[in-house]
């Protein structure tokens, strides 16, 4: 692939705070962070050795689109500060079109997953127990079926790179967050998902599920943080190929997950390198999702 990929940033003008699975985070000042979307890709909570060129820029564009579109539901951590203004001139190519300056908030210790359709780990849970994260669902549902009575909130723990997220029950979420905050996170998550899913359907995309993250400011005001409804955090299905009973081809990194399942990787580090043909098809899916949703 002709375009060079950014696997890891090397900003020296700011202190590095954290390298996540995909994002590198730097301190700007005591109230702001620089978050850079690299081209790293993770699957099954493991970072793969092969970056996907332009992926970080695509995720940044999609996140900004959703942060703006959904700001009437809940405030988010974005600021008007330009990333180029806080780094040196020689570092600007590392932040251009792939970074945000955000408010420094206290992240909540759960991932807020919303499922509108049964797929992925939710489908596996349902096959095993008839439930997803302790939520009982009617018998006889098929893979990729729309969940009766509307989307459900199914939180999980937040894993560091190399560890695995674990689905948790709502009662455990309440223990971690407190009753009122858990209720607010659940309510806002479902409202965000519903608004996004309704819009996406007008663009012939089904958002099967997604993951949100939230943070609190010093006044305990809740904010949407991290990323929003990207192909990394969501399952996007083309509506025209949707058929209940089988998960359709998607505009997201499920393509990489499927490839990893096919080669029988054991889902522990080190991950195998991604072949060129899988890379090309993955970036085409990300580009298509961005084009269809944001234009």
UniProtKB/Swiss-Prot annotation:
Concerning Gene3D superfamilies, the annotation shows:
ATP-grasp fold, B domain, Phosphorylase Kinase, domain 1
Task: Supply the gene name.
Answer: purC
Q: What is the lineage of its organism?
A: Bacteria, Pseudomonadati, Pseudomonadota, Betaproteobacteria, Nitrosomonadales
Q: Name one GO cellular component term.
A: cytoplasm
Q: Which pathway does this polypeptide act in?
A: Purine metabolism; IMP biosynthesis via de novo pathway; 5-amino-1-(5-phospho-D-ribosyl)imidazole-4-carboxamide from 5-amino-1-(5-phospho-D-ribosyl)imidazole-4-carboxylate: step 1/2
Q: What is its EC number?
A: 6.3.2.6
- Protein name listed in UniProt: Phosphoribosylaminoimidazole-succinocarboxamide synthase
Q: Name one GO biological process term.
A: 'de novo' IMP biosynthetic process
Indicate yes or no for the key word Nucleotide-binding.
yes
| Catalyzed reactions | 5-amino-1-(5-phospho-D-ribosyl)imidazole-4-carboxylate + L-aspartate + ATP = (2S)-2-[5-amino-1-(5-phospho-beta-D-ribosyl)imidazole-4-carboxamido]succinate + ADP + phosphate + 2 H(+)
| GO MF annotation, one | phosphoribosylaminoimidazolesuccinocarboxamide synthase activity
Say which enzyme class the record assigns.
Answer: ligase
From what organism does this protein derive?
Nitrosomonas europaea (strain ATCC 19718 / CIP 103999 / KCTC 2705 / NBRC 14298)
């Amino acid at each position: 692939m002709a375009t060079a990929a950014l696997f890891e940033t090397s900003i020296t003008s700011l202190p590095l705070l954290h390298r996540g699975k995909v994002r590198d985070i730097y301190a700007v000042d005591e109230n702001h962070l620089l978050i850079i979307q690299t081209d790293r890709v993770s699957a099954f909570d493991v970072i793969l050795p092969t970056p996907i060129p332009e992926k970080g820029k695509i995720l940044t564009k999609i996140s900004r689109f959703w942060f703006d579109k959904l700001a009437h539901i809940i405030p988010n951590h974005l600021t008007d500060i330009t990333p180029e203004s806080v780094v040196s001139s020689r570092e600007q190519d590392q932040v251009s079109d792939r970074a945000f300056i955000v408010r420094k908030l206290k992240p909540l210790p759960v991932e807020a997953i919303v499922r509108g359709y049964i797929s992925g780990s939710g489908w596996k849970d349902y096959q095993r127990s008839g439930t997803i994260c302790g939520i009982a669902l009617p018998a006889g549902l098929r893979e990729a079926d729309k969940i009766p009575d509307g989307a459900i909130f199914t939180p999980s723990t937040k894993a560091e790179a190399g560890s695995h997220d674990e689905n948790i029950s709502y009662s455990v979420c309440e223990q971690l967050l407190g009753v009122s905050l858990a209720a607010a996170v659940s309510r806002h998550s479902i409202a965000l998902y519903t608004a996004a899913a309704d819009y996406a359907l007008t663009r012939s995309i089904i958002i099967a599920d997604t993951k949100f993250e939230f943070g609190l400011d010093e006044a305990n005001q809740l904010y949407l943080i991290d990323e929003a409804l990207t192909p990394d955090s969501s399952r996007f299905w083309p509506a025209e190929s949707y058929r209940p009973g089988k998960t359709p081809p998607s505009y997201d990194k499920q393509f990489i997950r499927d490839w990893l399942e096919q080669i029988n990787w054991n889902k522990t580090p080190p991950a195998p390198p991604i072949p060129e043909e899988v890379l090309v098809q993955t970036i085409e899916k990300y580009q298509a999702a961005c084009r269809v949703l944001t234009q």
